Curated annotation (Swiss-Prot):
Source organism per UniProt: Schistocerca gregaria
GO molecular function: structural constituent of chitin-based larval cuticle
Sections of the chain in a coiled coil: none
Functional note: Component of the abdominal endocuticle.
Protein name: Endocuticle structural glycoprotein SgAbd-4
Length: 116
């Protein structure tokens, strides 16, 4: 991290906006931050849905401890913002006994919901 009074230069910055609503931008700073994104306009699949943007991008930076971080993401109207990165926490593995129970339950036929 730079001291608060130090100016960080922009090494490169590009932006393209197209008449169809699509776009692309990227930048890189003097302290190693990089980011990019591409957006595409999509038509809704139903008549009552409007158009929406699907965005894909990434950013990377070096943390205060010197660790390099990188995040890739996609954002749309169905799933929202979905980031991925090797440094994100992951859930612990399912214990074997629970996994066996889940596997067994998956083999059973479904039963209808009881009516009130």
């Amino acid at each position: 991290q730079a001291p608060p009074d130090k100016v960080i230069p922009i090494i490169s910055q590009n932006e393209v906006r197209n008449p169809d609503g699509s776009y692309q931008w990227n930048y890189e700073t003097g302290n190693g931050i990089k980011a990019d994104e591409t957006g595409t306009l999509k038509k809704g699949s139903k008549p009552d849905e409007g158009d929406f943007i699907v965005a894909q991008g990434s950013f990377s930076y070096t943390g205060p401890d010197g660790t390099a971080y990188s995040v890739q993401y996609q954002a749309d109207d169905e799933n929202g913002f979905v980031p991925q990165g090797a440094h994100f926490p992951t859930p612990p593995p399912i214990p074997p006994a629970i996994q066996r129970a889940l596997d067994y339950l998956a083999t059973l036929p479904s039963t209808p919901e009881p009516r009130p």
